[in-house]
Amino acid sequence: MIIYLDLDGVIINWVKGIFNWFEIPYDPSKVTHWDSIQELTNNTKQEFWTKIKFSAFWENLDFYPDSRLFIDRIKKYGEVILLSSPAYGCAGYRQNWIEKNLPEFFNNGHYILTPSKWTCAHKNTILIDDSDENYQKFIQNGGNAIIYPQPWNITREIFKQEMSEQEKNNLVIDTLYLMKNQIRSN
């Protein structure tokens, strides 16, 4: 079984990186939908992406506090491959981040950088991602997927109260356990 693990919004606190980059006081509760960030930074979509197209931004993003433990827990269920959709023109920066922060994945080539995550989907794969679109396309193309709970995706309708990172990780691990057993029995 291959478990594809998204980075931004799952193990990397991309939102905090944005708040820091634009010198906005960090308040993740203000990010309530996918385009919140552009609105909070008072930029058009194009302006926003242009302003973060720098190595200093992408290469210095921080993990969520429990991310390394989360990765170790996921490894118990299959081969973990990082699957990231870097911003246009920033793939090299993402690769540098992986080399610096997750050298075991970098050195073993256990990462894929593509905006078309759905191309990795097949019946023995599970994607863990915070994007509704990536989640849906992965399933539509024959893979299995778990949506990582974040206020900007469909889980906001299910979980009305804010969840801690540990609660999110535990929910994903529990779902991964059930999903792996279901895949095994099919």
PLM-predicted stretches and their roles:
Residues 19-23, 99, 142-146:
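Glycine-rich, phosphate-binding/catalytic loops in enzymes
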Residues 126-163, 167-174:
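Acidic, Mg2+-coordinating phosphoryl-transfer loop and its flanking beta/alpha structural elements
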Residues 49-56:
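Short glycine/proline- and acidic residue-enriched helix-loop micro-motifs
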Residues 58-62, 67-98:
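Substrate-recognition element of Asp-dependent hydrolases with the DxDx(T/V) motif
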Residues 83-128, 132-137:
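Substrate-recognition "cap/lid" segment bordering the active-site pocket of phosphatases
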Residues 99-113, 158-186:
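Structural recognition of alpha->loop->beta junctions
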Residues 1-49:
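Active-site neighborhood of HAD-like aspartate-dependent phosphohydrolases
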